[in-house]
C-alpha cells in the first residue's frame, strides 16, 4: 500500500513542479464537493510517504464527504514549488489546505493569500512562524508534537550514557524550519542540564548526504566527541556511516528523530541509540480531521483552536 501511495504522490509532485498539478486535478472534482489538499515536503522522505499513505487511507472512509489531493516537493528545500502549489490550489477553489511547510517564514505570504481567498489552512509537522503570522494578523493552527519536548526527551536519555563534561554535536534540520529550531533548542537544553559540552552545531537539512558530511566534519574537528544528536533519522543514518568511516563505531552515540522504518536495523544493532516516534500518520489524519471539522461546521479561520498537540514516544535501541 505504501508503495502504491508513494507512486501516486510522486506523480502529483512531478506535475506540480511542472506547474500542471491543480488545474488538471480540479477538472475531476465534482462541483460543490469539499476538497482538501495535503501539501507536503520531500516525497523522498519515508516520513512524508507515511503521512501521504495515512491521509489517503483516511479519505477512503469519508469519500462521500470530501476529495483529497496529496502533493509534495522533490526536496526538503523546494520552497518555490510549494508556494506555487498553494497558489494553484487557491486558483482551483480548494476548500482547505493542510500544509507541512518547507520554510516556516517563506510560506506565510502565500498562506495569507489562501486565507484571504476563503481557504481554511492548517499547518502540520512544522509550524508557521508566529511573528510573521502576527505581522499579518493571521492565525494558523498547528497540528503536531512539541518538538522541543521530543528533543529534550532524547537528549535526557543520551545524557544517561555520558559523563558530565563530555563533548556532543548537534546536526540540525533545515534551519528556517521552526520544528528544526525547536529540536535544536531541546537538544541544547538537555545537554546544558546534564553538564555536557555542545562543541558543534551544523545543519544537515534533513538529508542523509548532508547529515553524513556534517558528522564527518565534527568528528574530524572534535576527536573527543561522544555523541551526535540528529534532528531526523535520515541525518542519523548519514552520521552512522560517517562514524564508521572515521573508525569510531562504538565510541560515539548517535540519535535520530521520526522512527522511520528504515532505521530499525540500526536501532536493533545499537548503531543508533534512540529515536523519537512522532507518529507521522496521526499528524496527517488529525490535520485533515481539523480541516474537515472546520469546513463542515463553517468555523472561521480566526476561530480555530491554535494548537492540537499530537503524541511523541522515545524509541530506544533494543525496544521491540
Indicate where each model-derived feature is located.
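Hydrophobic alpha-helical
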Residues: 99-116, 187, 199-200, 204-265
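C-terminal segment of N-terminal export signals and the immediately downstream linker at the start
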Residues: 1, 22-36
Amino acid at each position: 500500500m505504501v508503495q502504491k501511495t508513494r507512486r501516486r504522490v510522486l506523480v502529483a509532485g512531478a506535475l506540480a513542479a511542472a506547474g500542471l498539478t491543480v488545474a488538471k486535478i480540479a477538472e475531476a472534482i465534482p462541483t460543490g464537493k469539499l476538497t482538501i489538499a495535503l501539501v507536503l515536503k520531500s516525497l523522498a522522505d519515508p516520513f512524508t510517504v507515511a503521512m501521504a499513505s495515512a491521509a489517503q487511507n483516511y479519505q477512503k472512509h469519508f469519500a462521500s464527504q470530501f476529495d483529497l489531493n496529496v502533493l509534495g516537493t522533490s526536496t526538503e528545500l523546494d520552497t518555490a514549488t510549494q508556494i506555487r502549489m498553494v497558489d494553484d490550489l487557491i486558483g482551483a477553489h480548494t476548500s482547505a489546505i493542510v500544509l507541512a511547510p518547507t520554510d516556516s517564514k517563506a510560506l506565510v505570504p502565500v498562506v495569507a493569500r489562501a486565507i484571504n481567498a476563503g481557504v481554511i489552512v492548517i499547518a502540520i509537522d512544522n509550524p508557521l512562524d508566529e511573528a510573521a503570522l502576527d505581522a499579518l494578523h493571521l492565525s494558523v493552527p498547528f497540528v503536531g508534537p512539541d518538538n522541543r519536548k521530543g528533543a529534550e526527551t532524547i537528549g535526557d536519555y543520551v545524557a544517561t550514557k555520558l559523563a558530565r563534561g563530555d563533548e556532543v554535536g548537534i546536526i540540525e534540520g533545515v534551519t528556517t524550519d521552526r520544528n528544526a529550531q525547536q529540536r535544536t533548542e531541546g537538544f541544547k537544553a538537555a545537554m546544558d542540564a546534564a553538564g555536557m559540552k555542545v562543541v558543534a552545531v551544523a545543519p544537515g537539512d534533513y538529508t542523509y548526504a548532508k547529515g553524513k558530511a556534517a558528522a564527518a566534519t565534527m568528528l574530524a574537528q572534535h576527536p573527543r566527541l561522544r555523541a551526535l544528536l540528529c534532528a531526523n533519522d535520515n541525518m542519523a543514518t548519514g552520521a552512522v556511516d560517517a562514524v564508521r568511516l572515521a573508525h569510531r563505531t562504538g565510541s560515539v552515540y548517535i540519535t535520530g528523530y521520526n522512527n522511520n522504518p528504515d532505521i530499525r536495523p540500526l536501532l536493533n544493532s545499537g548503531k543508533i541509540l534512540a529515536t523519537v516516534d512522532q507518529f507521522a500518520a496521526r499528524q496527517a489524519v488529525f490535520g485533515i480531521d481539523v480541516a474537515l471539522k472546520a469546513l463542515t461546521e463553517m468555523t472561521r479561520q480566526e476561530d480555530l483552536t491554535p494548537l492540537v498537540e499530537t503524541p511523541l514516544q522515545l524509541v530506544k535501541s533494543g525496544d521491540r
